[in-house]
Amino acid sequence: MPQLNPAPWFTILVFSWMIFLAIIPTKVMGHTSPNDSSPLSTEKHKTESWDWPWQ
C-alpha cells in the first residue's frame, strides 16, 4: 500500500512547514500598519474610592 510509505509524505510535510515557518512570517511581518496607535495622554486618571451603600 503506497499511502503507508512515509518517504514522499514526510518530505512534503517538512517542506511545507519550512515554507510556513520561514517565508510566510517574513512576508507578513514586513508590512507596517497604517494606523500607528499612540497614547493621547500619559497623565494618571484620578480614581476615587467609594463605599457600597449596603455596608
Swiss-Prot record:
Its main location: mitochondrion. The keyword Transmembrane helix applies. Keywords: ATP synthesis, CF(0), Hydrogen ion transport, Ion transport, Membrane, Mitochondrion, Transmembrane, Transmembrane helix, Transport. Residues 32-41 have a biased composition (Polar residues). The keyword Transmembrane applies. Pfam families: ATP-synt_8. Disulfide bonds: none annotated. It is a single-pass membrane protein. One of its GO terms (cellular component) is proton-transporting ATP synthase complex. GO terms for biological process: proton motive force-driven ATP synthesis. GO terms for molecular function: proton transmembrane transporter activity. It comes from the Eukaryota. It is found in: Mitochondrion membrane. The chain crosses the membrane at residues 4-24. Residues 32-55 are annotated as: Disordered. InterPro entries: ATP8_metazoa, ATPase_protein_8. Belongs to the ATPase protein 8 family. Component of the ATP synthase complex composed at least of ATP5F1A/subunit alpha, ATP5F1B/subunit beta, ATP5MC1/subunit c (homooctomer), MT-ATP6/subunit a, MT-ATP8/subunit 8, ATP5ME/subunit e, ATP5MF/subunit f, ATP5MG/subunit g, ATP5MK/subunit k, ATP5MJ/subunit j, ATP5F1C/subunit gamma, ATP5F1D/subunit delta, ATP5F1E/subunit epsilon, ATP5PF/subunit F6, ATP5PB/subunit b, ATP5PD/subunit d, ATP5PO/subunit OSCP. Subunit 8, of the mitochondrial membrane ATP synthase complex (F(1)F(0) ATP synthase or Complex V) that produces ATP from ADP in the presence of a proton gradient across the membrane which is generated by electron transport complexes of the respiratory chain. ATP synthase complex consist of a soluble F(1) head domain - the catalytic core - and a membrane F(1) domain - the membrane proton channel. These two domains are linked by a central stalk rotating inside the F(1) region and a stationary peripheral stalk. This is ATP synthase F(0) complex subunit 8. The gene is mt-atp8.
